[in-house]
């Protein structure tokens, strides 16, 4: 719930310090020290883009005892070098490694020295940064109307899971309406689709997917203003909100404003403990049929897969599998982060994840659905933060967007291949059908702490799965 610390990185500079040269020693003159400080600061702030910020263990960010003169500055630089953070001061033509970056299903080669000939990879930091900064960034806000009957006019220190989930769903809507290749235009007026999506995530009850409405929809799963919530409860809150929203709009004008079916995947094929969640093809087909009001045609579908991949920490056997999900063209990333600090994880390089951080406090803004000249800058971020994959909380949720039947079939094929690589411990599995099982737990036992145990009931009358069990894998 608190902000993840990090260090900014400038994308371009020819200064020797930016190339990782030694820091000035404690015997440097005052003039040399001043020049060194100016060099490194100009390196950091010389560009509108901050390429990377990295999360370090909290012990690395404890307040330092006061030091003066060149000793303190040298100590600061040595500490950066020792923690492996000096690369963050490199220029835009440099990257942490020559490894590929996978970002929401697209591959980028950030190294200027080793360009890939693969048609699956795009070269250059500029292309990656344009993609990253075009993603919808949703953060803490303050100054909005009080949430329901509470006195909360801000979600600071407790709303990060809600904000992370809003980011993931917003990307699904962007991909649906504007396509994966869409980038934020540099000129106004903006497209009605883009502005309409931002409007839906505004901070008022009038906005379909606001924090106000999500908390209301998730009450039965423990969502409440001022309280933190886990990924499973958050996914179920979205399921409830989307269903309620669709029913309301269909009653008013015959149309819903969520343009896809939503499938929260959980439980194993028999509803018993110990199995991986199952993507059931028949359930997905039924959800699409219901979305299309009984027609057999396939609809776009959003899949949310809540998981617990360990107890106190992420089980390392799942790391390669999590990394590979970012290579799926259907990837929407992960709701996850350090314990108690949810983020929106959207990419991976080597064993580090790249994420958008909701822990920045901004004033609430009202973007009208028809205001194509609106200032949308607070919904975009050009600072990439990274975190070691093995440090993320084992409670997380993975998202996928499938545009049509062919896209869903491709997703199922990739997921099945991932199962084959899992050595008996898959993230989730794919099956044609599942059998309903007996009720094992009461719905009242669920809570919003990310460790919910829910009923397994098969399909309900709406074609959606009942409240299924969510187990530690």
From Swiss-Prot:
The active site is at residues 160, 357, 359. Pfam families: Peptidase_C54 (PF03416). Its main location: cytoplasm. It catalyses: [protein]-C-terminal L-amino acid-glycyl-phosphatidylethanolamide + H2O = [protein]-C-terminal L-amino acid-glycine + a 1,2-diacyl-sn-glycero-3-phosphoethanolamine. One of its GO terms (cellular component) is cytoplasm. It is found in: Cytoplasm. Keywords: Autophagy, Cytoplasm, Hydrolase, Protease, Protein transport, Thiol protease, Transport, Ubl conjugation pathway. One of its GO terms (molecular function) is cysteine-type endopeptidase activity. Residues 1-33 are annotated as: Disordered. Its EC number is 3.4.22.-. PANTHER family: CYSTEINE PROTEASE, CYSTEINE PROTEASE ATG4. Interacts with ATG8. Belongs to the peptidase C54 family. Cysteine protease that plays a key role in autophagy by mediating both proteolytic activation and delipidation of ATG8 family proteins. The protease activity is required for proteolytic activation of ATG8 family proteins: cleaves the C-terminal amino acid of ATG8 proteins to reveal a C-terminal glycine. Exposure of the glycine at the C-terminus is essential for ATG8 proteins conjugation to phosphatidylethanolamine (PE) and insertion to membranes, which is necessary for autophagy. In addition to the protease activity, also mediates delipidation of PE-conjugated ATG8 proteins. This is Cysteine protease ATG4A. It comes from Oryza sativa subsp. indica (Rice). The gene is ATG4A.
